[in-house]
Amino acid sequence: MAKKYFGTDGVRGEVGQFPITPDFVLKLGYAAGQVLVQHDGGQKPTVLIGKDTRISGYMLEAALVAGFTAAGVNVIQTGPLPTPGVAYLTRALRLSAGVMISASHNVYSDNGIKFFAEGGVKLSDEIELEIEAKIDEEMKTQPSARLGRARRINGADDRYIEFCKSTFPSHLDLRGLKLVVDTAHGAGYDVAPKVFHELGAQVVSIGDEPNGYNINEKCGATHPKALQAAVLQNEADYGIALDGDGDRLMMVDRNGKVYDGDSLIYVIAKARAREGINIGGVVGTVMTNMAMEIALKEQGVDFCRAKVGDRYVLEQLNQRGWLIGGEASGHILCMDKHNTGDGIISALQVLAALQMLNQDLATICADWQPYPQTMINVRIQKGQKWQEASKDVLAEVEKELEGKGRVVLRASGTEPVVRVMVEARQADWAKKGAERIAAAITGKQ
């Protein structure tokens, strides 16, 4: 059954527009609360609510709290805390669920609601459908004796800081390193610099002055230019950039070069392989560069691809029992450290890997150079049989690449567009192949 409200990462949209309105979020909290009470055998469950730094977080938090307590659910509020921190505390405090109010890397005028189940894992499709089935039902507030309570927890950030530090090898530290940390004026603005400082690094913080309106604005993992400039200006060893909710990571070296999620995953995997740690393999996506796949296999590390989205990477990791995965966008999963993507913890694993290998980022990543890629967005009409139109040319291009490149055709889930991506060892091969396939789709061969 198709979901009506939940997307791949919870419920998200523009604030004030359905479904990110106070009345809908009130109903969402009430519906989720009803499902929790049913699954807890009629007991009074407890949920944790965290948020990022958007001005709308106050409004949406109040609506969620009202909905949950009306359904007979107790609520613990943390205030601003990264999404992976909410997942961790949901598990550590043995709560029935966790909720994060955030739109991740989006602009401040967007917001969203993301749920975690018991244990800090993402909700199953089945539970999301149960919640959706109750959203449109009439709200019937519990009798006063059954209403939930709401309270703020002290020290949530300190608990999360200690957890992050515990994932860094105990025989290593960060003394002697100068780091610039860009927290995108987001949920990690307070905790992230403290983690690196308490492990011994000299920390220069930027993007750490949230005002409710500046989250992700020309800063953070999606806008690394500010970090590049700060690293060069401060003559730092490395720069670390998170996104608004703290689950993405980009890094910059002392020369100002940016390293995306694929590069950082390779660094972590190579170090683990050299240390003899069995990670099983690495899960990337259909968009992961083929050169990285080849480089990993040269290190003796298996590789497979999932659909685009950290949710699908996580599914593959769990199915295969592998430990490392992620995307170029900076979502990195280290399953032996945390059960969700965590920008701070991922950065710590990269910094540990650099010490284990006794090399810098540039040296390690010189193992592979990304194959050139050409991406063309082709607009299509509703009902257009683009697969049939392109299949012959697609087969020709794949044959010509002779296993030294890849073709990915992907229909957009949000607009009438087919994304044509061709990757090859030579840029002109990629360009010509993508143009031929795009022409076949449009019928302009």
From Swiss-Prot:
Concerning Gene3D superfamilies, the annotation shows: Alpha-D-Glucose-1,6-Bisphosphate, subunit A, domain 3, Alpha-D-phosphohexomutase, C-terminal domain
Q: What class of enzyme is it?
A: isomerase
Kindly list the positions annotated as binding Mg(2+).
S104, D243, D245, D247
Catalytic residues, chain numbering:
S104 (phosphoserine intermediate)
Superkingdom of origin organism: Bacteria
Q: Which InterPro entries match?
A: A-D-PHexomutase_a/b/a-I, A-D-PHexomutase_a/b/a-I/II/III, A-D-PHexomutase_a/b/a-II, A-D-PHexomutase_a/b/a-III, A-D-PHexomutase_C, A-D-PHexomutase_C_sf, Alpha-D-phosphohexomutase_SF, GlmM_bact
| UniProtKB keywords | Isomerase, Magnesium, Metal-binding, Phosphoprotein
Q: What Enzyme Commission number(s) appear in the record?
A: 5.4.2.10
- Chain positions found as Phosphoserine: S104
Kindly list the cofactors needed: Mg(2+)
What family is this?
Answer: Belongs to the phosphohexose mutase family.
Q: What is this protein called?
A: Phosphoglucosamine mutase
Q: In the record, what lineage is assigned to the organism producing the protein? A: Bacteria, Pseudomonadati, Pseudomonadota, Betaproteobacteria, Neisseriales
Gene name of this polypeptide: glmM
